[in-house]
From Swiss-Prot:
Cofactor(s) recorded in Swiss-Prot or TrEMBL: FMNH2
Cited InterPro entries: Chorismate_synth, Chorismate_synth_AroC_sf, Chorismate_synthase_CS
Source taxon at top rank: Bacteria
Keywords attached to this entry: Amino-acid biosynthesis, Aromatic amino acid biosynthesis, FAD, Flavoprotein, FMN, Lyase, NADP
GO terms for biological process, alphabetical: amino acid biosynthetic process; aromatic amino acid family biosynthetic process; chorismate biosynthetic process
Gene encoding the protein: aroC
Function: This reaction introduces a second double bond into the aromatic ring system.
Protein name, as recorded: Chorismate synthase
Cofactor annotation remark: Reduced FMN (FMNH(2)).
Amino acid sequence: MSMNSYGHLFRVTTWGESHGPALGATVDGCPPGIDVDAAAIQHWLDRRKPGQNKYTTQRREADEVEILSGVYEGQSTGTPIQLMIRNTDQRSKDYGDIAEKFRPGHADITYWQKYGIRDPRGGGRSSARETAARVAAGGVARLALAALVPAVKITGYMVQMGPHGIDRECFDLAQVDENPFWVPDAKAADEWAAYLDGLRKSGDSVGAVIEVRASGLPAGLGAPIYGKLDTDLAAAMMSINAVKGVEIGDGMAAAALTGSANADEIHMGDNGPEYSSNHAGGILGGISTGQDVIVRFAVKPTSSILTPRATITKAGTPAEIITKGRHDPCVGIRAVPVGEAMMACVVLDHILLQRGQIGGKVGETRGKIG
């Protein structure tokens, strides 16, 4: 297996390279009768596409999605949905110098060691360009969620850029779409702009932390031990290019808490169980509680920088490399809609799994309380 697919019942396979003629996704398992149109998917792709401001790569790609199969008269047929995005602004000549050299921090050397062949143009299959296909697939998942569980809302945002985090006291989701960093803190957005301007001018890059929140989920999604909702969410986020760490709820910070501080106490509300806090990130024992599911992931600094670095060639000789081409000074910015897409795909997958195993209406729990 070459591991280009993810999901159980809602299964996505992505294909294509950064500088190939096209890339895309095959979405298998979308329920029939879902309203699916290219314009709706395009909305999500437009949030990820490059060249929208000075803080992202200046590669100009329209990222226009084409639906090749699985949709008839605007509705899903239950057969595989093939999505394609044509590449139109490749500059393969920018990568001539790295055909024989390995870029530090990139997958060049590991792809070569594994396969004995690699596409050096823009990183080939290992390029973050692959995430456009994920966002397209996530668009299909969002449309299915809107039809099956309209209450579900998925929102991603940046909570840290380099050493600079947001002020949680100023947290305001209404600010997310008002700045180029998808940050829910207006003051932080201004500070980050000045910080990233300095890094851009020096030819350097920086990492980030992205948080993705799914609200309106029913309790009961996920399964014990090996089918945990958080297991699949962690794997989905970890599969995104440049991601080096994933947390659910308080994550690593929970290790510093006492049991009494970490406990999300339960009481009975008018509409069922309610919790005093959400340290667990909406998941207990691998199963959703009905609270917001909260996931964070950290992306490393973009490895494509203008600073000269030591490396070796395929022949093993010492070399120096400066990465040319057009690159993101902070890949975390465009990782926000990618994280949202992965959340949508995993959540829909588990809703379909729950329906298949337990039966009944979507979101209906078997164990009644009160």
